[in-house]
């Protein structure tokens, strides 16, 4: 659920998916979005031999339909400098649909994805921890549900009018 560009770094998720498939994990990846990296990502999936495990959906407008098919939102951004500052809409949307997130900890994401509560925020490049987090959520659907609901509540709290006002005023009082 994002632009398919180098900052969103879906190519990193394809590498992780290959490792998961090689371990026999029951995984599929739905890539939602359009962008300059689409052809490269399709070629990478084919080169890795995982094209049967990856579906490229293009732009998705029906978020309800999309999230009915998604158990976990995986997110592998690679933000350098000021690129991609802040939390992506995909994480907010996952929260609204009670979907836990496994993500690299980049650009303030840890404010939304709290490891062990609303999903897992993994240090950038730690593929083993990323795989372990996904595996935990696959094996424990009740935990997946709890984390999804916790993310929903957290999104509602952080995006409330009162919280936006409070943080805006705090920024001006610095």
Protein language model annotation of sequence segments:
Residues 37, 51-60, 66:
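Active-site donor-binding acidic/aromatic loop of nucleotide-activated sugar
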Residues 115-116, 120-127, 136-141:
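Conserved acidic donor-binding segment of nucleotide-sugar-dependent glycosyltransferases
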Residues 3-19, 36-42, 128:
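A conserved mid-protein helix/loop that constitutes part of the nucleotide-sugar donor-binding site
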Residues 129-132, 136, 143-158, 164-170:
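A short, well-ordered alpha-helix in the C-terminal region of glycosyltransferases
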Residues 64, 88-96, 110-111:
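Short alpha-helical segment that forms part of, or immediately flanks, the ligand-binding pocket
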Residues 13-14, 29, 130, 168:
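A structural motif in glycosyltransferase catalytic domains
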Residues 68-83, 99-100:
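Acidic donor-binding loop of glycosyltransferase active sites
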Residues 100-103, 113, 121:
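Short hydrophobic beta-strand element within catalytic cores of glycosyltransferases
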């Amino acid at each position: 659920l994002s632009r398919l560009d180098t900052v969103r770094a879906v190519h990193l998720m394809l590498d992780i998916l290959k490792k998961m498939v090689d371990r026999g994990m029951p995984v599929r990846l739905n890539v939602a979005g359009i962008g300059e990296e689409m052809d490269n990502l399709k070629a990478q999936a084919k080169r890795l031999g995982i094209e049967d495990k990856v579906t490229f959906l293009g732009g998705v407008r029906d978020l309800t339909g999309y999230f009915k098919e998604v158990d976990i939102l995986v997110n592998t951004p690679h933000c350098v400098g000021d690129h991609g500052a802040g939390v992506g809409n995909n994480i907010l949307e996952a929260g609204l649909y009670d979907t836990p997130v496994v993500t690299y900890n980049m650009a303030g994401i840890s404010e939304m994805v709290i490891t062990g509560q609303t999903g897992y925020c993994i240090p950038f490049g730690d593929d083993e921890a990323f795989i372990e987090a996904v595996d935990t959520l696959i094996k424990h659907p009740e935990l997946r549900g709890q984390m999804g609901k916790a993310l929903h509540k957290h999104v509602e709290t952080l995006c409330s009018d009162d919280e936006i006002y409070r943080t805006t005023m705090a920024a001006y009082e610095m």
